[in-house]
Curated annotation (Swiss-Prot):
CDD domains in alphabetical order: UDG-F1-like
Source organism superkingdom: Bacteria
GO-annotated biological processes: base-excision repair, AP site formation via deaminated base removal
Catalysis: reaction(s): Hydrolyzes single-stranded DNA or mismatched double-stranded DNA and polynucleotides, releasing free uracil
One GO molecular-function entry: uracil DNA N-glycosylase activity
Similarity comment: family membership: Belongs to the uracil-DNA glycosylase (UDG) superfamily. UNG family.
InterPro entries noted in UniProt: UDG_fam1, Ura-DNA_Glyclase_AS, Uracil-DNA_glycosylase-like, Uracil-DNA_glycosylase-like_sf
Cell compartments where the protein resides: Cytoplasm
Gene Ontology CC terms: cytoplasm
Protein name according to UniProt: Uracil-DNA glycosylase
EC number: 3.2.2.27
Primary location recorded for the protein, binned into one broad class: cytoplasm
Amino acid sequence: MATDLTWHDVLADEKQQPYFVNTLHTVAGERQSGMTVYPPQKDVFNAFRFTELGNVKVVILGQDPYHGPGQAHGLAFSVRPGIATPPSLLNMYKELETSIPGFTRPAHGYLESWARQGVLLLNTVLTVRAGQAHSHASLGWETFTDKVISLVNEHREGVVFLLWGSHAQKKGAIIDRQRHYVLRAPHPSPLSAHRGFFGCNHFVLANQWLEQHGEKPIDWMPVLPAESE
């Protein structure tokens, strides 16, 4: 079921809520005080910029942004071109190599091409202090991204949710399994990938579901913008 509603339509009220205003104020204050916060301000909402609500086919939930220099740019698991591919994403590529014929691991970790095909790459917390994982947990971002998930649940039909690890699985508890396709596995991080992420076949299952429901499957081979033009 398509929707003509945009993120702007469905999130306008949420962005007026005191908790959300406070979240933005806190993050802006840290930046102004000289702290380095990732991703850069212009990139914080890129997941919504690249994947409009009406185009969402797949949701992949991350946790909080990468906290190293130049990595985070607003898409979960993705890093900018020229930045080394992080371990969790490398493991995602390994799973793709073993499950999708012809997939060859790219030399980059930039997933904008996934986002532009309808893969919402959503971190549950949208900012982080440099070098301090989870430093912006409990600022209010979780409330906002809970709302985002509930809006996808409500306004879209037949979305594939890929929930990797207990954090994402708890976050996805509200999803209506009668209307959407929920796939669960351990997180692709090196700590847990061997406990069942490898071999989960989620990328294949997602595409099978999309095709069965009349949607174009995702091309999981990440391409840089210049390559796709």
